[in-house]
Amino acid sequence: MTNSGALDTKFHALIQDQIRSEFTASQQYIAIAVFFDGADLPQLAKHFYAQALEERNHAMMLVQYLLDRDVEVEIPGIDPVCNNFTTPRDALALALDQERTVTEQISRLASVARDEGDHLGEQFMQWFLKEQVEEVAAMTTLVRIADRAGSNLFHIEDFVAREMSAAGADPTAPRAAGGAL
């Protein structure tokens, strides 16, 4: 079923690492959502529960890509996640840092695919690059709104309810193994 020799590329090894990063991001967003739920901030909680599913779907898109390329896939464990936040802004800042880190990882994946002459891999990464521009922009805006709102958390809740509702499935997104949730 799988070609174990295909994992010999640096790009495929980095995809395996990225699967771990995406699953970790999913769990981190669940931890952030639970924090917001516990603080009675339902709009922020709902937003981050949805973000957790999105990150899970990203991991499964990477899995599907490796399966489609006949590369053996190993589902990894995850890195530790942070569960303790002093303020809602701290949780949002962590989410922004996480998105910036993922952007660096995705950019590296695209560069390695190009360096290795893996045109299929490079093309596959283009959707993720576009997605990261959107994710960093959204988290940057959310942190700025939190800064402007100060201690009035209802302003943040109102903004999230009004401006950050789910956009629906992206028809250009890669297929996720097992289907997107």
UniProtKB/Swiss-Prot annotation:
Residues 5-150 form the Ferritin-like diiron domain. It comes from the Bacteria. Its EC number is 1.16.3.1. PROSITE patterns: FERRITIN_LIKE (PS50905). Gene3D superfamilies: 1.20.1260.10. GO terms for cellular component: cytosol. Fe cation 1 binds at residues 22, 55, 58. One of its GO terms (molecular function) is ferrous iron binding. There is a cross-link at residue 10 (Isoglutamyl lysine isopeptide (Lys-Gln) (interchain with Q-Cter in protein Pup)). Iron-storage protein that displays ferroxidase activity, catalyzing the oxidation of Fe(2+) ions into Fe(3+) ions, that can then be deposited as a ferric-oxide mineral core within the central cavity of the protein complex. This is Ferritin BfrB.
